[in-house]
């Protein structure tokens, strides 16, 4: 399953990326995220592990994420490997002609078990609607934080 969403913001890509890549501030930016704990010592980089507490589907969820890729000022990719489902979430930022930037959230998932693979055709439509709703709440929160910093 893949879900893609995009939104523009009145900011330079480098400024937007700095806000998106500062994952420790996400609880102040993204309303569904209640806390982020950095589990890997040192600066945020590829390989950094995080523990995220968020409200999803109306319930609390704690998950461990890994920063798989940081390509400044363009892309931040997070990975989650759950026993039943593996997923990736890309935050991609591009310049927009005339100024500003476009931020995309790209969610990709794949079942991790034979049972999950068998159920995927039945579950995907329901999961996609619900996950899209969740991402559609996160994206404006990020865009608002980015726009607060203006077109600098």
Where do the protein language model's features map onto the residues?
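Hydrophobic ligand-binding cavity/cleft-lining segments
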Residues: 1-45, 141, 147, 152
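Well-ordered beta-strand positions
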Residues: 8, 68-69, 94-95
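Glycine-rich portal/gate segments that line the openings of hydrophobic small-molecule binding cavities
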Residues: 38-88, 100-102, 137-152
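Short, flexible segments with low predicted structural confidence
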Residues: 15, 38-39, 64-65, 106, ...
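Beta-strand/loop substructures that line and gate deep hydrophobic ligand-binding cavities in soluble
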Residues: 79-133, 137, 142
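Beta-strand elements of well-folded, non-transmembrane domains
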Residues: 11, 58, 109-113
């Amino acid at each position: 399953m893949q879900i893609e969403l995009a939104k523009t913001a009145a900011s330079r890509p480098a400024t937007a990326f700095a806000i998106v890549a500062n994952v420790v501030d996400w609880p102040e930016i993204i309303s569904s995220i209640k806390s982020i704990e950095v589990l890997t010592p040192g600066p945020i980089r590829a390989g950094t592990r995080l523990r995220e507490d968020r409200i999803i589907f109306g319930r609390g969820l704690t998950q461990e994420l890994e920063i798989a890729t940081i390509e400044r000022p363009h892309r931040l990719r997070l990975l989650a490997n759950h026993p039943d489902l593996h997923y990736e979430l890309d935050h991609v930022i591009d310049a927009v002609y005339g100024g500003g930037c476009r931020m995309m959230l790209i969610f990709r998932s794949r079942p991790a078990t034979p049972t999950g693979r068998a159920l995927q055709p039945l579950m995907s439509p329901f999961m996609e609607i619900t996950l899209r709703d969740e991402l559609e709440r996160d994206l404006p929160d990020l865009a608002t934080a980015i726009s607060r910093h203006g077109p600098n």
